Amino acid sequence: MADYLTVTHLTKYLKLKFDRDPYLERVYLTGQVSNFRKRPTHQYFSLKDESAVIQATMWAGVYKKLGFDLEEGMKINVIGRVQLYEPSGSYSIVIEKAEPDGIGALALQFEQLKKKLTAEGYFEQKHKQPLPQFVSKIGVITSPSGAVIRDIITTVSRRFPGVEILLFPTKVQGDGAAQEVVANIRRANQREDLDLLIVGRGGGSIEDLWAFNEEIVVQAIFESQLPVISSVGHETDTTLADFVADRRAATPTAAAELATPITKTDLMSWIVERQNRSYQACLRRIKQRQEWVDKLSQSVIFRQPERLYDAYLQKIDRLSMTLMNTMKDRLSSAKENKVQLDHALANSQLQTKIERYQDRVATAKRLLMANMARQYDSQLARFEKAQDALLSLDVSRIIARGYAMIEKNQALVASVSQITKGDQLTIKMRDGQLDVEVKDVKNENI
């Protein structure tokens, strides 16, 4: 009689076959994403073609490293291992790596992020800041060793000598590049002496330029209070930094030209033109005034000038007489008031009171002067005492009394415990110094 297997035994046997089959340990598979619903952690969906479907699992760590978002109906190429799930007897593929079919992962990530940021309004024209016409200092965020900074310096120096360039040395590709770009954009915005920023690098592959497609870089440029000119890659290269920047330049030279829209030559020509226009306007004004003066000089009043001031002379005479009479009246009134005041003072004995107060003031003055003299003598004595104390601490005066000062390695020696045999010492005396070598050390208290 034949032995019958249980479902469990058969399933375990098949699972063992799946697990040990080398062809199923690493499977290269292409298919269309189906039944995809994005989850917070692991992703579960199906891969299908025209004739078949297989369940797929992608762990959270793998999905996080994809660099693009899976979408329903997207065709992808995956690498993974096939496994059997015993409870249901179904098999699935555990995906270890995936990329879009027919388009690079970075290109897809670029399009997805561009779509997202466009929907959020990052690239709208209303957020663009105007570039200043005149600048005194330009910040440049790029590699210190590339051709970008050299081209910018050369172009700015040619167009408007005197404009300063402040370089923020920055890693522009590879791990950590995006973080450096963001940090330097924020550093530049903390300064008060910059007029605008140029952010850029030379050409390269999409991988080389990828730092300027990172969302954190787009966010930093969008939040910049300084106007930003983007100059990333060659003319045919386009990054998300170009879309969010206030202006995009195809080359570093073009970026420098945008930063200095008016050259020094343009400015000087404008000044000369304004000077000429002002000069011509002044000449016309002078000519008009001269014609007016000539016309006025031919009038009747200027041919008989005495008629111009006769009336004023008469008015002056009248005012003079009025003033003299007024002064006489006021002087007479003042004399009468003085007589009355003199009489009142004599009757009130005010003079006696004034003299008494003058005596009291004189006495107070003498006391004050005496007190000030005592204070001065006391302060002078304290000063002289302090001066003597300070002079007693003067090293040069101590040495002059016959003492010497010993130094070791230019440091003052205060005890024999600081000295060992063979040390080189300097002995300073009032009329010179000795350089000596210690032959022996003895400890003795004075």
UniProtKB/Swiss-Prot annotation:
It is found in: Cytoplasm. Its main location: cytoplasm. It is an enzyme of class 3 (hydrolase). It comes from the Bacteria. Coiled coil: none annotated. NCBIfam families: xseA (TIGR00237). Bidirectionally degrades single-stranded DNA into large acid-insoluble oligonucleotides, which are then degraded further into small acid-soluble oligonucleotides. This is Exodeoxyribonuclease 7 large subunit. It comes from Streptococcus pyogenes serotype M5 (strain Manfredo). The gene is xseA.
